[in-house]
Amino acid sequence: MKKVLVKAVHGYQRWISPVFPPACRYYPTCSNYMIQAIEKHGPAKGLAMGTARILRCHPFCQPGYDLVPKHFSLRRNWAEPEKKEEEDSK
């Protein structure tokens, strides 16, 4: 099931996404987030996390880093980018 979902997202990235102008306000992009979430948390939780991310991605949201969290969550991951910046500054 995991492979089927990842292949579906790859199909979207290859055939559908290029037709539209870039609109994702987060890094990584919503489709890459979906793939990472599926690979890290499994098909059901990953699909739920990816869908929640797509619903968060709109013109009125605050853009920025939103990495796949270590633990399952449907909310935006605010803490990890700050930790990453602290590690990079050392």
UniProtKB/Swiss-Prot annotation:
Its main location: membrane. SMART domains: Haemolytic. InterPro entries: Membr_insert_effic_factor_YidD. One of its GO terms (cellular component) is plasma membrane. It is found in: Cell membrane. It comes from Lactococcus lactis subsp. cremoris (strain SK11). It is a peripheral membrane protein. Could be involved in insertion of integral membrane proteins into the membrane. Keywords: Cell membrane, Membrane. It comes from the Bacteria. This is Putative membrane protein insertion efficiency factor. The keyword Ion transport does not apply. The keyword Glycoprotein does not apply. Belongs to the UPF0161 family.
